[in-house]
């Protein structure tokens, strides 16, 4: 299994639509950086957030109640205020179409981590297609800004030694083709 370089990421994105929209260079002046890097791609967070703000609720991943969260549009302000010790969901600006022989892993950016903002994203499985739902936690006792339309995490691509027998698409993955923020799902 090999870590893929910028030239491979660029080729797969421009010729096969792996990342769209695709930024061929790293943009980093006066913004939290995004775009192509040496061995990865820095993704951007969109302007829509879902804040988990019902203090009297129980979060149950097997029976999620959407009333436990509030949608917030941060496009006008350009940022979202994540309250102290709070959790929110968001989604990427980029749409992904993963190759069948490749898995991607996403790691939060150090700029946010150094401010106590932790970003979690599960792996992008072979042949997954869709926007990425991003989990964002504020681990501090202070409110924190998360900037819309700027970098939030870095994706690294690992190509398998052989093609998997069954991809995410083949299995009918429950988040296949997701658009916007996608809440937890359990197949029944």
Swiss-Prot record:
Its EC number is 3.5.4.13. It comes from the Bacteria. The keyword Nucleotide-binding applies. One of its GO terms (biological process) is dUMP biosynthetic process. Transmembrane segments: none annotated. It is an enzyme of class 3 (hydrolase). CDD domains: trimeric_dUTPase. DCTP binds at residues 109-114, 154, 168, 178. Keywords: Hydrolase, Nucleotide metabolism, Nucleotide-binding. The active site is at residue 135. Signal peptide: none annotated. Belongs to the dCTP deaminase family. Catalyzes the deamination of dCTP to dUTP. Homotrimer. NCBIfam families: dCTP_deam. This is dCTP deaminase. It comes from Helicobacter acinonychis (strain Sheeba). The lineage of its organism: Bacteria, Pseudomonadati, Campylobacterota, Epsilonproteobacteria, Campylobacterales.
């Amino acid at each position: 299994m090999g870590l893929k370089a910028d030239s491979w990421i660029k080729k797969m994105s421009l010729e096969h639509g792996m990342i769209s929209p695709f930024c061929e260079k790293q943009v980093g002046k006066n913004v939290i950086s995004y775009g192509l890097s040496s061995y990865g791609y820095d993704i951007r967070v969109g302007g829509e957030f879902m804040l988990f703000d019902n203090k009297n609720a129980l979060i149950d991943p097997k029976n999620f109640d959407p009333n436990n969260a509030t949608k917030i549009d941060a496009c006008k302000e350009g940022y979202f205020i994540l309250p102290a010790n709070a959790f929110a969901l968001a989604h990427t600006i980029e749409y992904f179409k993963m190759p069948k022989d490749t898995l991607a892993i996403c790691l939060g950016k150090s700029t946010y981590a150094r401010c106590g903002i932790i970003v979690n994203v599960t792996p992008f499985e072979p042949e997954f297609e869709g926007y990425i739902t991003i989990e964002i936690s504020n681990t501090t006792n202070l409110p924190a800004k998360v900037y819309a339309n700027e970098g939030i995490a870095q994706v690294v691509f690992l190509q398998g030694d052989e093609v998997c027998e069954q991809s995410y698409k083949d299995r009918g993955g429950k988040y296949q083709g997701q658009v916007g923020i996608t809440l937890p799902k359990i197949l029944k």
